[in-house]
């Protein structure tokens, strides 16, 4: 949820520093430490809810690698944040009966960092690199021979004293995860034998995830309430579970109950400024800004400047869901509010 000062007027789109949005699909430290969330993770591909086509393809590839006693081909998983890329990497390693070693691309700052990771691998292990599109060029180039030939080609020394050294590596599987497929260079992308998109989840799939987690945390969740929560979770399990935890907080602290009803969910989400579409204050301010421009396309940088926000954040965090539900369209000339989006925002009080 975007926390916006109550002093902001209807026509003032300059935001102060924001806290976490409940409907932001990015992970946060609290969620990484949450034991209940870790317990809620599936233990194998069969337990993983949703992504049926992806699971079927992975099942065939995994079984084939086991039959041939070869490492699984390098795998690239791409899609919006919060859809389960990291979980799938762990499950793939589990199905292969091997370890999964984790790294994030921003933490691999120098070539020696990736060298250390590769030299630490054992035969058949999985190396998972999150945000792989953020690898720097030198680090990425070291991966080429490692992925293709399971070797490192290193240059030692400098100038006339430079010499090449080749280090053989154990056969391993690299799993890369990215939210920005287009940002991955073609040479790196082409070295992945398996490339799979993780799609948004259906309401029924999210409902099952919510119900399973509510049982884990001993929460009495009414059937219709679980579906209502699934509908506003933006097709993203991470958001669904985050909203459920905040609704639980409201139920236990404000309403003094452990039973979650449809009416209680409405009250809880209203207190967090989230409406029946799953949109929060930032979404509504974005739509209101477009609505003020009388159906004239607006460039992303102009929108970011008008809202006092980061253009990259708007493009990759705010806009995808607004496009998905038909409220926003992107044109060569800029962003346009659709008729559906205009009808929605005209019906809303900007102060919610």
Curated annotation (Swiss-Prot):
Gene3D superfamilies: 1.10.8.60, P-loop containing nucleotide triphosphate hydrolases, Winged helix-like DNA-binding domain superfamily/Winged helix DNA-binding domain
Highest taxon of the lineage: Bacteria
Region (Small ATPAse domain (RuvB-S)): 202-273
BP terms from Gene Ontology: DNA recombination; DNA repair
Annotated localization: Cytoplasm
Gene Ontology cellular component terms for the protein in this record: cytoplasm; Holliday junction resolvase complex
Positions contributing to Mg(2+) binding: 86
Segments for region (Head domain (RuvB-H)): 276-352
Chain residues that bind ATP: 41, 82, 85-87, 148-150, 191, 201, 238
Signal sequence annotation: none
Entry EC no(s): 3.6.4.-
Region: Large ATPase domain (RuvB-L), residue numbers: 13-201
The keyword Amino-acid biosynthesis is annotated on this UniProt entry: no
Reactions accelerated catalytically: ATP + H2O = ADP + phosphate + H(+)
Sorted UniProt keywords: ATP-binding, Cytoplasm, DNA damage, DNA recombination, DNA repair, DNA-binding, Hydrolase, Nucleotide-binding
Xref: SMART domains: AAA
Residues that hold DNA according to the record: 330, 335
GO molecular function: ATP binding; ATP hydrolysis activity; four-way junction DNA binding; four-way junction helicase activity
Classification via NCBIfam families: PRK00080.1, ruvB
Similarity comment: family membership: Belongs to the RuvB family.
UniProt subunit comment: Homohexamer. Forms an RuvA(8)-RuvB(12)-Holliday junction (HJ) complex. HJ DNA is sandwiched between 2 RuvA tetramers; dsDNA enters through RuvA and exits via RuvB. An RuvB hexamer assembles on each DNA strand where it exits the tetramer. Each RuvB hexamer is contacted by two RuvA subunits (via domain III) on 2 adjacent RuvB subunits; this complex drives branch migration. In the full resolvosome a probable DNA-RuvA(4)-RuvB(12)-RuvC(2) complex forms which resolves the HJ.
Record remark on domains: Has 3 domains, the large (RuvB-L) and small ATPase (RuvB-S) domains and the C-terminal head (RuvB-H) domain. The head domain binds DNA, while the ATPase domains jointly bind ATP, ADP or are empty depending on the state of the subunit in the translocation cycle. During a single DNA translocation step the structure of each domain remains the same, but their relative positions change.
Function, in words: The RuvA-RuvB-RuvC complex processes Holliday junction (HJ) DNA during genetic recombination and DNA repair, while the RuvA-RuvB complex plays an important role in the rescue of blocked DNA replication forks via replication fork reversal (RFR). RuvA specifically binds to HJ cruciform DNA, conferring on it an open structure. The RuvB hexamer acts as an ATP-dependent pump, pulling dsDNA into and through the RuvAB complex. RuvB forms 2 homohexamers on either side of HJ DNA bound by 1 or 2 RuvA tetramers; 4 subunits per hexamer contact DNA at a time.
Protein name per the record: Holliday junction branch migration complex subunit RuvB
Source organism (scientific name): Prochlorococcus marinus (strain AS9601)
